[in-house]
Amino acid sequence: PMESGLYYLEFSDGSGSPLRVKGPETEEAKQAMVGGTESSLYIGAAKTNRFWAVSKFDLDTDEFYLDVEYAAPAGEITWRVSLRKKIAKFQRWMSRKKKRLFVRYFNFFSKHVKRTGNKIFFCSASRSRIGGNEQFIRDRMLERGLDKKFVFRYDFVASINERRSLRAFMRFGYYLATSDIIVLDDYYPQVYLPDYPPDVKVIQAWHACGAFKTVGLERMGKPGAPELNTRIHKCYTHIPVSSELSVRHNAEAFGLDESKFYPVGVPRTDIFFDPDYIRRTKKKMYEAFPQAKKAKTVYLYAPTFRGINARDAYFPFQKVDFVKWGQFCKETDACLLVKMHPFVRESVEIPPEYADYIIDAASYREVNDILFIVDVLITDYSSIIYEFSLLRRPMYFYAFDQKMYEATRDFYEPYEKTIPGQPIKSFDELMDTLREGKFDYQWLDSFVRKNFTYTDGKATDRVIDQIILGKK
């Protein structure tokens, strides 16, 4: 049986010679075939292994392809399908019921437990323990002795889909309802459900810098866009960002007033100005990746995922020739670290003959730590470019599907005007570019000035002083 996925079509005549099939003539017609959902082909007439297929068009390669999904066999379209529909309906009802109960639970403790003004709650639904911006804030507060003033509370789960015990969930709700300051670092559905008292601070210590890809309400009309009347993100009272440009971008994305955004800097960028941290981290990274210490040049390939969200995230690995990249590394005495986005579940297939030159760095969570041993970054649409730019090192942009990405996700500003470089469209062009090694540092300097109000390593202190402590 075939698998669900994207299938590019090759056409040939009766003798086997390839045929060029003419696609849509106008850009409007091409765009219409990018995100279509109406099934246009049905594959298989047997009782098993039947599939729906949607005919689509690749804007970057001018090729037709089929978006194929498994379809239930005829024998299944009876009591099994009916049962599944009933189960799904019951699950939706239960979900609504749970949300209402959670809000009532929150409201009870919020009303009857007096706040003391000193309880700060760190939480996340994307990591199992404290990390990222939240950890930098907490650790710096400890260094400054603020644990004598504040009571620290914590609740972390690896993902929004992770099941947890009733006791753990009730503790989360209690902390949420009785804390004076709530700090989160990503999307967290349960945080958006209740209404908070006006004196409670809800701080979104967002994990990304800059104003790059469209998010939230900026994605209207694109796959995965939120509803206009959504409660998502609306509870935030304070959001630290890296620049005035980020203020405008995130205000539009979250549908919030610009006054809720503070261009004080992003805490996790402080490490790029801390010589002791850099020295310790480089030693740790070389122990984790010994091949990197021996190499003349260390490359990092860190692309973002494709798809709408974590559930359907993927990466088109066929666009990367790891055999050619391995040969390049061997010839140039280089090392390639590959760090896929955490949403991508498929592992990188490294050619065995180049296992000493290509390393899958997926097991190491904090990509910023890896950056200190990297000489050259290769990415596409990842926000990693902001942190890496602070090191003033070359970066290249392998954007093989730029038009498709713009059609389905898009950018806050035009892609070519955002990145400190030029898009690279083919893998062979990428290899040629890496061999040449040319890079315009003027682009990089302009990029840093545009996206960082401060480059002094004191962002965490500003977040603590201006947002948590409320100093002017």
Where are these regions (language model features)?
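C-terminal amphipathic helix plus adjacent low-complexity
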Residues: 107, 277, 426-472
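A donor-sugar binding/catalytic signature common to diverse glycosyltransferases
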Residues: 182-211, 364-408
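Basic, ligand-binding patches in group-transfer machinery
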Residues: 1-118, 143
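Catalytic binding pocket for nucleotide-activated donors in carbohydrate/polymer assembly enzymes
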Residues: 350-354, 383-451
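Donor nucleotide-activated moiety binding/catalytic core segment of transferases
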Residues: 166-181, 189, 342-386
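A nucleotide-sugar donor-handling region in carbohydrate enzymes
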Residues: 96-106, 209-219, 226-310, 314, ...
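Conserved catalytic-core segment of nucleotide-activated headgroup transferases in glycan assembly
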Residues: 129-140, 253, 261, 267-350, ...
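Extended catalytic core of nucleotide-activated donor transferases of GT-like folds
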Residues: 160-228
